[in-house]
Amino acid sequence: GHTGLGITRQYRDGSLLNPRLWVMPVTPYGNYATFEEFQDFNVPKAEVIDWYRSMVDFGLTYNTARLVYAHPPGAYEWLDVTRNFIAYGNSKGANRFRWYTIERLADFMAKRDQVRWSQTPLPTGALQVVASHPSSLAEMVWSVPKDRYLKPTSVTGATVSDGGAFWLVKARAVGTLRFQLKPNPNYRPA
């Protein structure tokens, strides 16, 4: 099953029947996923609050999205927990944490699926990365591990920012981007 995964594809008997369809599996807390279930099975509110906070932290740590599901009547009955969850997510800052609808994530994934990119070794030992999209690469980001590569150079169609352990190569609203990656001389494979 897909339970707990990020946005993914739906395969039936090993076949991708609808390549335009994206699915967003629910992420449960153990056996339960809704406020009604938490209430029916006496899951303490403090545990649910901790779980919601850990979901936000997981999303930030792994740069991913997970679906947390709630029926409106159940959310209303647990309004204190709902408000705590929303406040915790918002407290992380809009530049680090965002709320998305399933539709918005599916649109992004469909756009991402159209990105074509390649990396070519250069005689200098660097890698040349080239990416393209039929309409725009806007919103696309390449995470480059700093321990393995120096700051990307010869960048066109993108900006480079410091993402902690990664260089973030963020595409502009262009059809094609390029950048070069030079190996970090201090890199030691594990």
Give names to the regions the model predicted.
Residues 1-59, 108:
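Active-site-adjacent pocket scaffolds in enzyme catalytic domains
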Residues 4-6, 46-134, 148:
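C-terminal domain-boundary segment and adjacent tail
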Residues 20, 64, 138:
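Residues that flank catalytic or metal-binding motifs in active/ligand-binding sites
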Residues 20-21, 126, 176:
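A residue-level signal for beta-strand positions that form part of recognition/binding surfaces
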Residues 132-151, 179:
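Surface-exposed beta-strand/loop patches in extracellular or lumenal glycoproteins
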Residues 155-159:
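Small-residue (G/S/T/A) turn/hinge positions that recur once per unit in extracellular repeat modules
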